[in-house]
Structures are given as structure tokens and as C-alpha cells.
Amino acid sequence: MLSIMATLAASLLTAAPAQAVDDPGLALGNFELRPIGNKAELQGRVDKLNADLPNIGVNSILKADARQGTWSSGVCNAAAVESGTKPENFTRSFCFDDADNGNANSEWWPQGVTTVADADEDQTWGDPEAGWNPADHKPMMVTWYNKDDWNGDKKPDDADADGLNTERKGVRVSFIDSSTGKYAHVLLVYPFINSSGNASYMSVRTSQHYSSSQYNYGSLHAGGIVWYGYYLYVADTNRGFRVFDLRNIIDLGALPAEKWGTSKTAIGRQDGVYHAHGYRYILPQSDGWTNTACDTVEPPPGTPCDMQDNDKTCQANDVTPKTSFAGLDRSSSVRHITTGEWCEKAQVTDAYTTGRVIRRPMNASGGTPKLDANGYWAADEAYRIPYNTSYTDNGGIQGAAVINGTYYLSQSRGMSNGRLIVARPDTGTGRLVETSPRRLSAIGVEDLSVWPGSPNQLWTVTEHPGKRMLFSVTP
């Protein structure tokens, strides 16, 4: 098998980029993203919040007396791997504190990973200050979604340990100091104008309105994140991306004590007091990119994007993709964000149930997408995720990273160690084809992010309560 893989790998490395034409599920027109229809309105709401509330920067958050995690040159959480194992080419790990490592009742589950190496080519953020050198405090970020449907009835109404009215807390992002291990959570929020005409905000959900629908619009899954320039691109499974500008981070803790509500059961402005489910920092959405079926995140009930994440299928005739994960590629001549679809374990008889990966170009500066003549963010490559009959489990991909045309895919496998899959595009079939045996990873691996260097590093995070670990491997 290895000799066959080597021969195939050599042929793929010399193949000229092209797009397969015989697979309708890979037609690039399926994957264009449009700017959300209410961008100007959203920005106006954010401006009102910024006028009312104090802002704070990334480094100021890292300087604060926050939570304390642990860096290790070994596996910092033995429960994150099967007994006696370690991810292949392992380099370093980070463990959250005991509360965030979680237990059987954990409400927050980690998903997406990005770092300052995505954000800026020099891999630092901000300018030196007295007693603070940004080169010694390089930030990393991890998204977490609020698990609000424990019984699987597609109704995000299951109260957590904080009591009533705590469902649908949405998404938080951990800002992590890659040197000290200090970290803090920032709650992502969606701004709106309340009935009194004041700027307020709610949690980030699959749709940003209340409804009696069976779906009830649960917390956004946020399975991927890319930090590029000042912007965070957070995966919206059924649309594309929610976009957050880091210049808009708000520090509720800097308000007078009577204005900051620390209750974990409330969010938004209520009677002149600002709540955020107990969190100090919030970051409001200011922009977004959406597929052609959904032009806003405030749609009337019943539109194509009024569904929970797992309602989109993974079939041969799929058109509109899921955006389950995301990663930045700085190695290509034009920078790209690579997204892809999580699909459950593929059936052994169906090579089309593994999902797809899609690449969209980014501008070299400004942190913005590279748009076509119509103002759309169009894809220029798309491929089927590997289907390899040498293995009984295909699909289950939770993250993708690309370095010099080689794709690295993180595959979760329940409570067994996951795998890192290495593949190259076969442009004749439109499918990624594996070029080496699958590599041992950890339990519950998620999104991937590249930290360029000598050597390069691939970062991922494991999601299961009690088994959580942020770690890197060399590709």
C-alpha cells in the first residue's frame, strides 16, 4: 500500500491546478458567499455600543489577572489520549483550568482554533510597552459553543448548572497567552436596538431572533475560526461566516459597579445594567458572509437557514455547503481560507458522504476577502474529502489546514484516538487522495490552525469534557 501511495503522491505533486467538471457537487458556483444584507445596520448598532461602553484591546485582556492554564512539553492531560499513546510528531500542549477542562455536565465545548500567526505575518500583536513585549506574549484563540440541547430533541431549552434562563449562551472565545498560560473568555454577542431605542445584544445563535419554532435557534456551533488582521471569521455552519472586529471588544468590568450585571442568567442591557451571562468581556458581530440561500442572520421563520447544524445532509447531490471548520493558508501565493464539512462516518459503499473542502482567496492586507467583480467572495477550489477503502472509517473531519498544496485533515473517532489525514488534490476526480498512512492524534480532535515556522506546527483542540487539551504537532 505504501508504494502505491508514494507513486500516487508523486503524480499528484506535479499535477497542474484544475477543477473537476464531472461532479456537480463541486461546481464552484455552489460556494460563493455574499455580504450579509444588514451589514450597515449591524455596524450602526456596534457604533452605539462603543459610544456607550468602554473598549479594550487583546493585549490588555492578556495582561489582566485572568484564568491560569498550563503549558507542557508533554501531554498535559493524560485523559486526552488513549492509555500509553501520544499524537504522532507531538510538540507541545496547553491545558485549561479544572473548571474549563469540564465534567459530564459541562455547558461549554471547545471547537475552533486560530493564532496570531494567522493574524499577522510577524506573528505578534500590538506594540511594545513598558513591561510588555508582544513578542513574549503571542495570543492564541479557541472558540467554545454552549451545549444547550442535551436530550437531542432539537430544542435548545435544556437549562445548565447556572439555573433557569441560561440556555443559548451562544459562543465564547478564549484568548490565551502562549507564554504565561493566562487566558480569559470573551463572549461573542449579536447587537440589536431594544424597545427603548437603546443598543443591546443577545447571544450568538443559529438565527438571531426568538421564535416558537421547533428549532428555537440554539447556540451557534462555531466549529472553526480564523483571525486575520483585526477580524475574527467565525464559522456559521449553515451560512458561511460571522465576522467580529477586535477593535470593538467591550470591557463591562470597566463600568461603574452598578452598571455591570454579573448574573449568569441574564444578557444584554436591562434597566440600564449590562449583563453577559457573568462574563466581563463581550465582542459584538459587525459583519458577515452568507451563502446565496440566506442573505441575513435575521430571516423570517421557515427560510432555508432556519435549521440546526445537523439538518444539512452529506450526499452526492448536495449544493450549498456546510461551513463546519476553517483555517488560513499563508503558504500559497494568494492567501486562502479553507473551509469544510463535517459529515458523520461515511458508509463503506458511498464515497460521497465524506464531505467537501472549499478554498476562498483573501487579500494580502486589510484582513478582508478577495472579491470577484460582483462583490462576491467566490471559491476557486473545491474537493471531496478522502474516501479510502483501506480504512473502515471515513468522514468525521473536524478541521483542515493547507501547507504548500498539501491538506492536513483532523478526523475525530468518538472516544478513540483521532487521526491526522495527509492528502493532495487529484484534479482529475476532484477528490483529495491520501499520500501517507493516517497518523495517530488525540481523542475528540477539532479544528486545525497552521503556525508557520521552522518547523511548521499544526494546532488543534480536543472537545470532550475531562479530556480537553490544546496541542501542536509538526506536519
What do these predicted regions represent?
Residues A161-S179, F244-R269, T349-K370, G418-G430, ...:
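Beta-propeller blade signature
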Residues K138-M140, G327-S441:
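Loop/turn-rich, solvent-exposed surfaces of beta-rich toroidal or solenoidal domains
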Residues N105-H137, Y217-Y228, K312-H336, D393-N404, ...:
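Structural signature of eukaryotic scaffold interfaces centered on beta-propeller domains
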Residues E32-D162:
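Beta-strand-rich domains and repeat architectures in extracellular enzymes and scaffolds
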Residues T143-K147, T237-N238, L246, G340-E344, ...:
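Short loop/turn segments immediately following the C-termini of beta-strands
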Residues N50-S106, G181-N216, P256-V319, G367-D393, ...:
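Surface-exposed loop and turn segments in beta-propeller and other repeat-based domains
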Residues V445-P475:
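Blade-level signature of beta-propeller repeat domains, shared across WD40, Kelch, NHL, RCC1
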Residues M1-A20:
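Secretory targeting and sorting signals
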